[in-house]
């Protein structure tokens, strides 16, 4: 098993909010100022015919690639992406998942929150600093475009001359996703219909955009399966992990799934978990990991098994009915042929409903030595109840009985320009009734839509208690992974049932809670997080399951908007902001 260095390393933020505003506002290049490099990309987003799982379909790609191109930079670098929308009939934005966007909240890539959607034929330029090493990704954030295939990897290395607190010889990058044969537009219409038409389970699991439908590369172990006949040159041919014996590999794993929670395992190999969501964790050994939509991990493996054999890599579905075959590929010990199948069948995915196993993995994640510690006390605490509801017969998801419906004018611009009629100025409820029974369906399933904002004072320490509950049908509660834009947060703890402060306060971990940007709520349970509202902007906080967000499962946070500097004009060209003349672009 790989060794991990004792010395922690945590890169400091590269630029302050003010310096970023000055640089971007006045067009000073970083090379002129003596700062780190600029990574410049020109992307065209368009629909393409593709065969992700050996069945031809339409995907949303970038520059003719699916998944999109990988961005690779060092912490402190500036990333510039000129994004041209070639979709013809719909807008587009891209969210840089896990990037904090300090000083550039307009570049967060959230339609109706940080910017206007980019119209067909138009180009929008994203500029932002990647300020912290880690494993990240990017994806569409308008409608359900992530489910259509608009995603790619974003890898940030330490600043030049710095090293990570662990050693490895080489690395492999894996982007996991789920795939449907039904178009995203049909899915969206079905979710918005009365009665609601559910999207169903995915047809395939993709590994770096590659999967197999209606056949298996492991059919020889199961006579009921059809063997895939592949030459290796097809778009759906497995992405093989080629390795040399007696080396240590860092495998970066990110999940951009629209629905599925996944389990990752490699036959005969242990995994040493060292990073989660761009933050170092106390290393621990496990046979497999559960990874929820929006999460990322780095694991180290040592190729110390029989070098004459190859080994299975298996990605199975967890927390949902097992109707989707596992995604499979090979850990290919060179110089063995990649066509040589392992002697044993693929690792078996744990039972889909074994939440105790999921919790045992999640509860082992702690911050690495030297990580920032949370403030001891909070200034404000929100209790967010997650329920399934209806509005006039339409099925919705709601938080504290409000289903999020985004306004046509982006919050960031509306608040900066003080357009008080652009959205509801009354904030949503900060808690829910103490006597609410989370173990039964809502007594009053009717809910309302809303677009109010939770506003925080700059520097305020905020606790959020995410509370899960029963759905509309009895005895049903689902896992929900929640992602916060613009911040990392400390995961203080998890619990069963309804959060009860006098008792559950004692369970919160203030010593070494992990920093994350995505966290799971287990069925009928609660999750407590803490963050500091120190990043001027407007930020989404939402379930990372695409259909759930589409149906209203999210809220919006705002802090320090008066401190936000220049907002590019193209981010303002919609809704009420498009009518404002002579808006001062600089503070």
UniProtKB/Swiss-Prot annotation:
Pfam families: Cu-oxidase, Cu-oxidase_2, Cu-oxidase_3. GO terms for cellular component: extracellular region. Keywords: Copper, Disulfide bond, Glycoprotein, Metal-binding, Oxidoreductase, Repeat, Secreted, Signal. Cu cation 2 binds at residues 97, 139, 544. GO terms for molecular function: copper ion binding; L-ascorbate oxidase activity. Glycans are attached at residues 360, 401, 475. InterPro entries: Cu-oxidase-like_N, Cu-oxidase_2nd, Cu-oxidase_C, Cu-oxidase_fam, Cu_oxidase_CS, Cu_oxidase_Cu_BS, Cupredoxin, CuRO_1_AAO. Its cofactor is Cu cation. It is an enzyme of class 1 (oxidoreductase). Its main location: secreted. Its EC number is 1.10.3.3. Residues 1-33 form the signal peptide. Cu cation 1 binds at residues 95, 483. Disulfide bonds join 54-236, 116-574, 215-228. Cu cation 3 binds at residues 141, 485, 542. Coiled coil: none annotated. PROSITE patterns: MULTICOPPER_OXIDASE1, MULTICOPPER_OXIDASE2. Cu cation 4 binds at residues 480, 543, 548, 553. Residues 38-157, 169-335, 379-559 form the Plastocyanin-like domain. Binds 4 Cu cations per monomer. Belongs to the multicopper oxidase family. May be involved in a redox system involving ascorbic acid. PANTHER family: FI03373P-RELATED (PTHR11709:SF394), MULTI-COPPER OXIDASE (PTHR11709). Dimer. This is L-ascorbate oxidase. It comes from Cucumis sativus.
């Amino acid at each position: 098993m790989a060794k991990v260095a004792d010395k922690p390393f945590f890169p400091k933020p590269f630029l302050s909010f003010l310096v970023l505003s000055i640089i971007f506002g006045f067009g000073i290049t970083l090379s002129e100022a003596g700062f780190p490099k600029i990574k410049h990309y020109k992307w065209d987003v368009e629909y393409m015919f593709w065969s992700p799982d050996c069945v031809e379909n339409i995907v949303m790609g970038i520059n003719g690639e699916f998944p999109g191109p990988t961005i690779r930079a060092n912490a402190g670098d500036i990333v510039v992406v000129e994004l041209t929308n070639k979709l013809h009939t719909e807008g587009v934005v891209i969210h840089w998942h896990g990037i904090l966007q300090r000083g550039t909240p307009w570049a967060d890539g959230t339609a109706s929150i940080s910017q206007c959607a980019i119209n067909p034929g138009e180009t929008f330029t994203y500029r932002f600093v990647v300020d912290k090493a880690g494993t990240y990704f990017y994806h569409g954030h308008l409608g359900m475009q992530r489910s259509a295939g608009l995603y790619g990897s974003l890898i940030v290395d330490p600043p030049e001359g710095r090293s990570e607190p662990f050693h490895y010889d080489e690395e492999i990058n894996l982007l996991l996703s789920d795939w449907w044969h039904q178009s995203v537009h049909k899915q969206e219409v079905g979710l918005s219909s009365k009665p609601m038409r559910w999207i169903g389970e995915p047809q395939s699991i993709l590994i770096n955009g590659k999967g197999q439908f209606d056949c298996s590369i492991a059919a020889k172990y199961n006579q009921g399966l059809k063997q895939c006949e592949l030459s290796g040159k097809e778009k759906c041919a497995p992405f093989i992990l080629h390795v040399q014996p007696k080396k240590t590999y860092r495998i970066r794993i990110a999940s951009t799934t629209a629905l599925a929670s996944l389990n990752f395992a490699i036959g005969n190999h242990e995994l040493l978990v060292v990073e989660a969501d761009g933050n170092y964790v106390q290393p621990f050994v496990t046979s497999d990991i559960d990874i929820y939509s929006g999460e990322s991990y780095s694991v180290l493996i040592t190729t110390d098994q029989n070098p004459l054999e190859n080994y299975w890599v298996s990605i199975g579905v967890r927390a949902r009915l097992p109707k989707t075959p596992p995604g499979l590929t090979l850990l290919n010990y060179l110089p063995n042929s990649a066509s040589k199948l392992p002697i044993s069948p693929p690792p078996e995915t744990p039972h889909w409903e074994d939440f105790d196993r999921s919790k045992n993995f999640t509860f082992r994640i702690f911050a690495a030595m030297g990580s920032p510690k949370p403030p001891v006390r909070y200034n404000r605490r929100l209790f967010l109840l997650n329920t399934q509801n209806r509005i006039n017969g339409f099925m919705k998801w709601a938080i504290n009985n409000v289903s999020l419906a985004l306004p046509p004018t982006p919050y960031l611009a509306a608040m900066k320009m003080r357009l008080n009629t652009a959205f509801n100025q009354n904030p949503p409820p900060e808690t829910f009734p103490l006597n609410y029974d989370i173990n039964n369906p809502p007594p009053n399933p009717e809910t309302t839509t809303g677009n109010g904002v939770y506003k925080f004072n700059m520097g305020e320490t905020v606790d959020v208690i995410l509370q899960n509950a029963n759905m509309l049908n009895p005895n049903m509660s689902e896992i929900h992974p929640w992602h916060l834009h613009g911040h990392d947060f400390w995961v203080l703890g998890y619990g069963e049932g309804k959060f009860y402060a006098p008792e559950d306060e004692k369970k919160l971990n203030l010593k070494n809670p992990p920093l994350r940007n995505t966290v799971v709520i287990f069925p009928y349970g609660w999750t407590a997080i803490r963050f500091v509202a120190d990043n001027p902007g407007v930020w989404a906080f939402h379930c990372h399951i695409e259909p759930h967000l589409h149906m209203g499962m999210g809220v919006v946070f705002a802090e320090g908007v008066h401190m936000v500097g220049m907002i590019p004009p193209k981010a303002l060209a919609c809704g009420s902001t498009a009518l404002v003349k002579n808006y001062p672009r600089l503070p």
